[in-house]
Amino acid sequence: MFRLLVLMGFTFFFYHLHASGNLTKYINMKYAYLSFIAIFLLAILTAVQAYLFIKSPEKSGHHHDHDCGCGHDHEHDHEQNKPFYQRYLIYVVFLFPLVSGIFFPIATLDSSIVKTKGFSFKAMESGDHYSQTQYLRPDASLYYAQDSYDKQMKQLFNKYSSKKEISLTDDDFLKGMETIYNYPGEFLGRTIEFHGFAYKGNAINKNQLFVLRFGIIHCIADSGVYGMLVEFPKDMDIKDDEWIHIKGTLASEYYQPFKSTLPVVKVTDWNTIKKPDDPYVYRGF
């Protein structure tokens, strides 16, 4: 009975993620077909387990009271004689993620995660892309052969370098950021606009902060926080996690806290916006 309930629960959970649109908070929707396969397989297993439960001797009323001396039902009896906690401990392992996934609210990543992990630009300084979470600069080279990656970046450079004004949307946020960080000198003086959540971090000046988005490559486990340093004409009182849309001119400057030269947006126009229903951005391949 417990097996049947657990399988029914997981089938419902995956279906609920699709129906509610919350699947995007866990994986890149490019891989949504995997969850459809999971739903299909779980539904089959649930049906099989339901059939076995209905046809079990306890449900059908056919009991074997005689002892043939051949060890019949010894394994079943041995299982029943185990202590309760031994028989059902394994189900707790499955029930915990199931209950938490269905009944607990889904927490989206925000600036508190950035603070906890430590916000730095070490990935760019060291060139070690494997050891830590990516910050500011997206790097998809990990997922391509070098020739293929270089070819894609050249195509993206041709796309964005032909624009006098670059408007980054949810669909191309990561690709646009990656292109600008890879060719910073080629975009100086260009107008750029995008939106994200504010994060002050180690900003030295009160008129500077970071505008960031959490980006997902495959799933939430490989997420990074990407965006740019922005500089306002005057001191601003913008709180962390406040969502803003900014527009300005691309420049570059040496940022002392990171000991690196960063692209920076000199803001000419900005406004606060409502937090999007889906706060994440995704990398297309």
Curated annotation (Swiss-Prot):
Example of a GO cellular component annotation carried by this entry:
plasma membrane
Q: Which InterPro entries match?
A: DUF1980, DUF1980_C, DUF1980_N, UPF0703_membrane_permease
Please name every pair of cysteines joined by a disulfide bond in this record.
Answer: none
Task: Establish whether keyword Membrane is in the entry.
Answer: yes
| Principal subcellular localisation of the protein | membrane
Q: Tell me, what's a Pfam family for it?
A: DUF1980
- Is-annotated flag, keyword Protein biosynthesis? no
- What subcellular locations does the record give? Cell membrane
Enumerate the UniProt keywords alphabetically.
Cell membrane, Membrane, Transmembrane, Transmembrane helix
Q: Which residues cross the membrane?
A: 4-24, 34-54, 89-109, 210-230
Q: How does this protein sit in the membrane?
A: Multi-pass membrane protein
UniProt family annotation: Belongs to the UPF0703 family.
Protein's name in the database: UPF0703 protein YcgQ
Organism field: Bacillus subtilis (strain 168)
